[in-house]
Swiss-Prot record:
Residue ranges of domain Radical SAM core in the record: 6-233
Residues noted as binding GTP in the record, renumbered to the chain: 15, 62, 92, 153, 254-256
Binding residues for [4Fe-4S] cluster 1: 22, 26, 29
This protein's name: Probable GTP 3',8-cyclase
Species name: Methanothermobacter thermautotrophicus (strain ATCC 29096 / DSM 1053 / JCM 10044 / NBRC 100330 / Delta H)
GO molecular function: 4 iron, 4 sulfur cluster binding; cyclic pyranopterin monophosphate synthase activity; GTP 3',8'-cyclase activity; GTP binding; metal ion binding; S-adenosyl-L-methionine binding
SMART domains documented for this protein: Elp3 (SM00729)
UniProt-listed PROSITE patterns: MOAA_NIFB_PQQE (PS01305), RADICAL_SAM (PS51918)
Record keywords, A-Z: 4Fe-4S, GTP-binding, Iron, Iron-sulfur, Lyase, Metal-binding, Molybdenum cofactor biosynthesis, Nucleotide-binding, S-adenosyl-L-methionine
SUPFAM superfamilies: Radical SAM enzymes
Membership in a protein family: Belongs to the radical SAM superfamily. MoaA family.
EC number: 4.1.99.22
C-alpha cells in the first residue's frame, strides 16, 4: 500500500542523488564538475533511508548524481538496496564509467540504467561536456545491453542550436543497440542555470508532432507524468516535457533525496527540504519515518492548472 500525499498522489519511488561529484562539465549544468565528496551519505545511511521508504510502500529506487559511478562503493550501495527487496532498482549515469561497472552492478541487483547522452557527434559531445569521452559512453551502452540491464534508456536533452537536429540519428543508434531513446526538454532546476535555459531551451512540440505522425503506436504512461511513448519501426522514443506541464506535477509519484541526506518533496523547489541527518546519526528509525511523512505532507504540485 502506497502512502499518498494530501493531493492524492501515491509515493511510489525514491530517487537518491548519492553524490554531487561529476567527471564531466556540461554546458547546461552549473555544478561545474564538482569534485568534493564532503557530506555525502554513507552506504549504510542510504540503506537506512531505503528501508524506511520500503516500509512506507515505495517499490522503486533510482540512484543518480552528479555521476553515481564516481562513488567507489557504488556496487555495495546497489547490493544493500537490493537486499531490501525493491521490485526495481535503476541508475542514471553519464555512461563514462559504465563499461567497467555494468557486469558488477547487474550482479549486485541493478535492473536497468539510463545513460545521459546528448549527441553522437564527437565535436558536439566535446562542446556539451567539455570532455572527449564519447567512445567510452558508446562502449558503456553496449556493455549495459550485453549484461542484460533492461531497459537501457538514452536520455537526450534537446538543446537549441546544438543537437536539436540529431534526434533521428540518435533514434537509429538506440534502435540498433536495443535501447530506448528519451528526448528531454531542458528544464530549469537547481543544477541547470537560467542562462542555459534561455540560451538552449528548445520547444520540442514540432518533434513530438513528427513522432505522432510516424508512430505505429502511442502509449501514455499515467504514473510517469502522462509522458508519451512512441513506437516507430521497432524502436521506442519517450518524450519528457516538464516545463509548465501540469500533468508532470499531477502524476508525480517520486520523492527525492539530496546527496547530504535531505528529503526533497519537489524537483523544482529547495525551500521545503526535510533534513534526515540527525536521525541517521542517531539510528532513529522512528524519527526517520516521521521525517518521511513530513516530506510527503509537504509535497505540492509546482505547476497547477
Amino acid at each position: 500500500m502506497h502512502v499518498q500525499d494530501r493531493h492524492g498522489r501515491p509515493v511510489m519511488s525514491l530517487r537518491l542523488s548519492i553524490t554531487g561529484r561529476c567527471n564531466v562539465n556540461c554546458i547546461y549544468c552549473h555544478r561545474d564538475g564538482m569534485t568534493s565528496s564532503r557530506g555525502e551519505l554513507s552506504a549504510a545511511d542510504i540503506e537506512k533511508l531505503c528501508r524506511v521508504a520500503s516500509d512506507l510502500g515505495v517499490g522503486k529506487i533510482r540512484l543518480s548524481g552528479g555521476e553515481p559511478l564516481i562513488r567507489d562503493d557504488i556496487v555495495e550501495i546497489v547490493e544493500r538496496i537490493n537486499n531490501i527487496g525493491f521490485r526495481d532498482i535503476s541508475i542514471t549515469t553519464n555512461g563514462t564509467l559504465l563499461e567497467g561497472y555494468s557486469a558488477a552492478l547487474s550482479e549486485a541487483g541493478l535492473d536497468r540504467v539510463n545513460v545521459s547522452f546528448d549527441t553522437l557527434n564527437p565535436e558536439t559531445y566535446r562542446f556539451i561536456t567539455r570532455k572527449d569521452y564519447l567512445e567510452r559512453v558508446k562502449s558503456g551502452i553496449t556493455s549495459a545491453v550485453d549484461v542484460g540491464l533492461d531497459p537501457v534508456k538514452i536520455n537526450m536533452v534537446i538543446l537549441r542550436g546544438v543537437n536539436h537536429h540529431e534526434v533521428w540519428d540518435m533514434f537509429e543508434f538506440c534502435r540498433e543497440k536495443g535501447a530506448v531513446l528519451q528526448i528531454i526538454e531542458l528544464l530549469k532546476t537547481e543544477s541547470c542555470h537560467d542562462d542555459a535555459v534561455e540560451r538552449y531551451h528548445c520547444d520540442i512540440t514540432p518533434i513530438e508532432a513528427e513522432l505522432a505522425e510516424m508512430a505505429d503506436r502511442i502509449r501514455t504512461r499515467k504514473f510517469m507524468q502522462d509522458r508519451k511513448k512512441y513506437y516507430i519501426d521497432g524502436g521506442e522514443i519517450e518524450v519528457v516535457r516538464p516545463m509548465d506541464n501540469t500533468r508532470f506535477c499531477a502524476n508525480c509519484t517520486r520523492l527525492r533525496v539530496t546527496p547530504d541526506g535531505k528529503l526533497k518533496p519537489c524537483l523544482l523547489r529547495n525551500d521545503n527540504l526535510v533534513d534526515t541527518r540527525d536521525a541517521l546519526r542517531e539510528n532513529d528509525t522512528g524519527r526517520l519515518r516521521e521525517l518521511f511523512f513530513e516530506a510527503i505532507r509537504r509535497r505540492s504540485p509546482y505547476y497547477t492548472p
